[in-house]
């Protein structure tokens, strides 16, 4: 968490785009290859869920946008971490990056390890204090991040580079995202305070 907080303190280079690569502005592309499908409906419902939490008042900055265990190196003592592979980096909402990290690091199968989430948020807030607007949007942005990664897997393996072995690869992330969405409204707020 503290490494993510340190990253978010770095000024975003001007050349970075200001939206997530597979964010909400791309979700409508599902209509090109799977219109009126169950996945199209799922993605639309999640977009409707997150939309009220998207605000120009949410802080933006340099974000990694893909903090999964494959992009983090932890030393042998497990007291230091390095975030690597910045190919998805953009200037976007900090809380989106926190949500993506919850999906990518704190996800365990089809559930979230809330002890890991708590540790992540504590570490983050040693570097940057979350604003109330970010705390209140955290669950929705975790759903947003999960939806974006699920969309990437679905579109990549079913449309962009179809691969029958991976047609259903998105489903575990979809289930994890649904788990986050089904938590009580104050669950993430309590973890962040």
Regions found by a protein language model. Name each.
Residues 1-38, 60, 170:
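A cross-family kinase active-site recognition segment
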Residues 45-46, 141:
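Short acidic/histidine-centered micro-motifs embedded in hydrophobic/aromatic stretches
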Residues 149-193:
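ATP/Mg2+ or Mg2+-diphosphate-binding catalytic cores
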Residues 95-129, 145-161:
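Active-site activation/catalytic loop segments of kinase-like enzymes and analogous catalytic loops
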Residues 130-142:
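All-alpha amphipathic helical-bundle segments outside canonical DNA-binding/catalytic cores
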Residues 48-96:
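Active-site acidic catalytic loop and adjacent metal/ATP-binding pocket
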Residues 26-34, 121-130, 167-185:
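Short, mixed-charge aromatic SLiMs
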């Amino acid at each position: 968490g503290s490494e993510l907080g340190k990253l978010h303190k770095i000024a975003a280079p001007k050349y970075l785009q200001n939206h997530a690569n597979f964010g909400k502005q791309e979700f409508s592309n599902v209509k090109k290859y799977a219109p009126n499908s169950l996945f199209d409906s799922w993605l639309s419902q999640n977009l409707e869920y997150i939309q009220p939490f998207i605000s120009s008042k949410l802080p933006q900055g340099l974000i990694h946008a893909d903090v999964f265990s494959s992009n983090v190196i932890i030393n042998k003592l497990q007291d230091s971490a390095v975030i690597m592979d910045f190919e998805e980096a953009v200037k976007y909402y900090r809380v989106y990056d926190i949500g993506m990290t919850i999906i990518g690091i704190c996800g365990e199968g089809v559930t979230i390890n809330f002890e890991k989430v708590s540790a992540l948020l504590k570490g983050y807030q040693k570097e940057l204090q979350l604003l109330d607007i970010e705390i209140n949007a955290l669950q929705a942005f975790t759903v947003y991040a999960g939806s974006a990664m699920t969309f990437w897997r679905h579109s990549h393996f079913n449309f962009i580079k179809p691969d029958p072995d991976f047609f259903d690869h998105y489903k575990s992330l979809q289930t994890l995202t649904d788990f986050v969405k089904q938590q009580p409204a104050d669950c993430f707020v309590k973890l962040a305070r």
